[in-house]
Amino acid sequence: MGWLFYTDRRVKTYADEKAEITRLCTFETDTRKTLLLKACKVGSTWYAAAKITNVDGSRVEDSAYVTDADGSITFGAVFLTRYDDGCWGYKDMEESAGPVESRAPLSLLALLSELKDPDSYAHAWRQRCRDWAAIPDYEEGDKIRLAAPVTLTDGSTCQIVTATHYRRGGKKRRCYRVAETGSLVRLSKSSLAGSQLLSSEKGEASPILAEFFAGRGADDAPP
């Protein structure tokens, strides 16, 4: 399915989006009923867990899912969303399609029914979500070895960094100090996948960073 945009512009806020995701995941046919159990937004993507039951109360039989104890099955769905000229739009797909977007939280995955085929696209998608959730959230002073060298915008590379932070608009923001040069860089969460904690030394914001910004505006930041 392609993108569908709401040209009436009735979807404007987070609450509007969640209400629409709920509506899209809640419907009933002559034989089955679908109900949204949980929806989470990560970035611009919504992740949903939808439960299917039979209207007559019998057990739901499905070729892909193991039926739960209450006779239902619950599957995962992904909704890509974006705004185009003020109009909200979405593109949806079930987990069985193996969506590229794979940042569903573990609390949502826990609601999904067991899969029958361990080699299915859905199984691989769930594993990618778990791998994403397993990426460490490092703290101030943690010294880290990245799984592979990361190429920076100036063409140099780094692999051993220490977590620190800078302030912008009164808020703390994560950055990393490169071991070899002392340079401060920002790294995406995906670049931390498979990284290893070498040591931990808690501390305040980097004194190097404080000196670096001493003569600059408060809202300056690492590149």
Predicted feature locations:
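Charged, amphipathic alpha-helical stretches
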Residues: 2-28
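Short amphipathic alpha-helical segments that mediate assembly, nucleic-acid/protein binding
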Residues: 17-20, 32-33, 59, 104-108, ...
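Amphipathic, interaction-prone secondary-structure segments
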Residues: 22-72, 150-163
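Intrinsically disordered, low-complexity regulatory segments enriched in Ser/Thr/Pro
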Residues: 48-100, 173-178
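Intrinsically disordered, low-complexity, charged/polar segments
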Residues: 86-126, 177-223
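Short alpha-helix capping/helix-loop boundary micro-motifs
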Residues: 128-133
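Short coil-to-beta transition motif at edge beta-strands of beta-rich domains
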Residues: 136-150
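Basic/aromatic-rich interaction segments and small domains that mediate binding to polyanionic partners
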Residues: 154, 160-190
